[in-house]
């Protein structure tokens, strides 16, 4: 959706499962999304870039997701992480001095779900 709505942005979709990679590739080709690339590998194997936005859904617990994706972040990276019902609890589980980087927004599609939103650089070691 982002690649279709914002052709001025480079969008990289990371997915390690072959069937999903194939589906994403077909969708990308069918929609002629020139600005979209599918990386068919684990996040840990993706070449480091400076990401303007990091978004991930149902990937890993928040602390692990941040540690894995943090190497792509800069001081101006926006984080948009749909986390469902556990959003507030997962933010509270972060180290106190680092949780201030994030807040929880109400999901627009599920009244019981939250989206973790933040801005800034995350490193695995504080």
Positions of PLM-derived features:
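Conserved SAM/SAH cofactor-binding pocket of Class I
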Residues: 1-52, 66
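Conserved beta-strand segments of alpha/beta enzyme cores
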Residues: 10, 35-37, 78, 100-103
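Short strand-turn motif at the edge of the Rossmann-like AdoMet-binding core
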Residues: 16, 59, 82-86
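Short amphipathic alpha-helical segments
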Residues: 25-26, 66-70, 91-94
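A conserved beta-strand element that flanks and buttresses the S-adenosyl-L-methionine
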Residues: 55
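A short glycine-rich, Lys/Arg-flanked "PGG" loop and its adjoining helix->strand segment in the class I
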Residues: 63-79
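Conserved beta-strand signature within the Rossmann-like core of class I S-adenosyl-L-methionine
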Residues: 75-89
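Active-site capping/gating segments
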Residues: 86-126
């Amino acid at each position: 959706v982002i690649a279709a709505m914002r052709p001025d942005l480079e969008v990289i979709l990371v997915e390690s499962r072959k069937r999903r990679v194939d589906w994403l590739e077909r969708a990308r080709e069918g929609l002629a999304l020139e600005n979209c690339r599918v990386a068919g590998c684990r996040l840990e194997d993706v070449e480091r870039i400076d990401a303007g936005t990091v978004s991930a859904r149902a990937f890993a617990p928040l602390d692990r997701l941040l540690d894995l994706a943090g190497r792509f972040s800069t001081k101006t990276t926006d984080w948009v992480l749909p986390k469902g019902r556990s959003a507030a609890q997962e933010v509270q589980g972060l180290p106190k001095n680092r949780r201030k980087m994030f807040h929880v927004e109400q999901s627009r599609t599920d009244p019981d779900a939250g989206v973790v939103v933040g801005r800034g650089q995350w490193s695995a070691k504080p």
